[in-house]
Amino acid sequence: MLPLHISLEKKKVVIAGGGSIALRRLKTVISEGADITLVSPDVEPEIKQMAEERRIKWEKRTIEKEDYLNAFFIIAATDNAAVNKEIAQSASPFQLVNCVSDAELGNVYMPKIVKRGHVTVSVSTSGASPKHTKELAENVDKLIDGDFVAEVNRLYQMRRKK
C-alpha cells in the first residue's frame, strides 16, 4: 500500500459502529474538518457528547447501505464482523474503506499518526499488529525534537510568504 496524506476537509465520512474502536477512528478524522456521520444504535459516552456538541451527526440505528452510498470515506467499525464485511464489499471501488475486523477487506489502513506542529509521521504495520504500531509510534514521537519542530514551523511560515 502507498502511504498518502489525504485531506478530509468537508468530505463525507461515515462511521459504522459506536464502540471503542469507532471512537479511536473518529478521533483521528474529526480534527481534519470532515463532515462525519456515525451510525450505531449505541455509542461510547464521548461519541454521544460529540454529537450533542454538533461536532458529528449521530444516527441512532443500525447502518444501511444508503448511509454510505455517497461517502468519500467509510469506516466499518461495528462489533459484528459480518456487518463490517458487508459494508466493505458493497462499497464502490471509488470509495475509501477501512474495515476494522478484517483490514484486507478495505482499501485503506489507518496508521498511527504522530503530529507535532507541521511535522507529521504516519506509522503502520499494514494491519498486522496494532500493538506494535502503537509502540513504534511512541518511539518515533520521542525522536522528534522540539527544536526540529520549531525549525520546520519557521520554514513553513517562510514558504507561505513567497
From Swiss-Prot:
Q: Which reaction does it catalyse?
A: precorrin-2 + NAD(+) = sirohydrochlorin + NADH + 2 H(+)
Signal peptide range in chain numbering:
none
Q: In which pathway does it act?
A: Cofactor biosynthesis; adenosylcobalamin biosynthesis; sirohydrochlorin from precorrin-2: step 1/1; Porphyrin-containing compound metabolism; siroheme biosynthesis; sirohydrochlorin from precorrin-2: step 1/1
Q: Name one Pfam family in it.
A: NAD_binding_7
What induces or represses its expression, per the UniProt entry? Answer: Up-regulated by sulfur starvation and repressed by cysteine. Also induced by O-acetyl-L-serine (OAS), a direct precursor of cysteine, maybe via inactivation of a putative transcriptional repressor of the cysH operon whose activity is controlled by the intracellular levels of OAS.
Question: Which amino acids does the record list as binding NAD(+)?
Answer: S20, I21, P41, D42
Its Gene Ontology molecular function terms? ferrochelatase activity; precorrin-2 dehydrogenase activity
Q: Which UniProt keywords apply?
A: Cobalamin biosynthesis, NAD, Oxidoreductase, Porphyrin biosynthesis
Tell me the Gene Ontology biological-process terms attached to this UniProt entry: cobalamin biosynthetic process; siroheme biosynthetic process
Q: What happens when the gene is disrupted?
A: Cells lacking this gene are unable to grow on minimal medium with nitrate as nitrogen source. Growth is restored only after addition of both cysteine and ammonia to the medium.
- EC number(s) per UniProt? 1.3.1.76
* InterPro entries attached to this UniProt entry: Met8-like, NAD(P)-bd_dom_sf, Sirohaem_synthase_N
- Please give the function described in this protein's UniProt entry: Catalyzes the dehydrogenation of precorrin-2 to form sirohydrochlorin which is used as a precursor in both siroheme biosynthesis and in the anaerobic branch of adenosylcobalamin biosynthesis.
Per the similarity annotation, which family is this?
Belongs to the precorrin-2 dehydrogenase / sirohydrochlorin ferrochelatase family.
PANTHER family cross-referenced by the UniProt entry: SIROHEME BIOSYNTHESIS PROTEIN MET8 (PTHR35330:SF1)
Q: Which NCBIfam families match?
A: cysG_Nterm (TIGR01470)
From the Swiss-Prot or TrEMBL record, give the protein name.
Precorrin-2 dehydrogenase
What organism does the UniProt record list as the source? Bacillus subtilis (strain 168)
